[in-house]
Amino acid sequence: MIKKKTYKPGSATIAQNKRARHEYFIEEEFEAGVVLQGWEVKALRAGKVNISDSYVLLKKGEAFLLGATITPLNVASTHTVCESMRTRKLLLKQREIDSLFGRINREGYTVVALSMYWKNAWSKIKIAVAKGKKTHDKRDSIKDRDWKINKDRIMKNANR
């Protein structure tokens, strides 16, 4: 009997958008499936994906991922056209799409991709409703992060 492949928590991550948490206030997160072609799945398994400039566009009651780059492998088939920046459809429930549509109609809100990961054998993407940060907000978050690191360092040394 074939044993199911189990991933450790955190090891199933394919790609992360670290810039998103720096440039946006994250309001609410959603999990969505991604419609992929065969060569794209192979490239994801090899880790050849970049979602740092990606965002979600809602059109006619459907959600699409734009700006994600999946680089084709050298051994990709020659009879298929490998377009690395193509628009990919996201699989969400209609209730979730309606919620996203209602939220992004507000001023300053957008939907960005946070991370892409494997869930069992399916490729999933974590998307979030986000509001853009101003420059002083970015500086404040950097100061808070640095203070937290210093505080942890001080507490670690104080306990010795």
Swiss-Prot record:
Extract the PANTHER family matched here. SSRA-BINDING PROTEIN, TMRNA-BINDING COMPONENT OF TRANS-TRANSLATION TAGGING COMPLEX
> Which biological process, per GO, is one annotated for this protein?
trans-translation
Q: Does the keyword Transferase apply?
A: no
Family named by the database record? Belongs to the SmpB family.
Q: CDD domains of this UniProt entry?
A: SmpB
Recite the UniProt keywords alphabetically.
Cytoplasm, RNA-binding
Name of the protein: SsrA-binding protein
The record's section on Pfam families has: SmpB (PF01668)
Gene3D superfamilies per the UniProt record, alphabetical: 2.40.280.10
InterPro entries, alphabetically?
A: SmpB (IPR023620), SsrA-bd_prot (IPR000037), SsrA-bd_prot_CS (IPR020081)
Q: Which GO terms describe its cellular component?
A: cytosol
**In the UniProt record, does the keyword RNA-binding occur?**
yes
Enumerate the GO terms in the molecular function aspect.
RNA binding
Q: What does this protein do?
A: Required for rescue of stalled ribosomes mediated by trans-translation. Binds to transfer-messenger RNA (tmRNA), required for stable association of tmRNA with ribosomes. tmRNA and SmpB together mimic tRNA shape, replacing the anticodon stem-loop with SmpB. tmRNA is encoded by the ssrA gene; the 2 termini fold to resemble tRNA(Ala) and it encodes a 'tag peptide', a short internal open reading frame. During trans-translation Ala-aminoacylated tmRNA acts like a tRNA, entering the A-site of stalled ribosomes, displacing the stalled mRNA.
Q: Where in the cell does this protein reside?
A: Cytoplasm
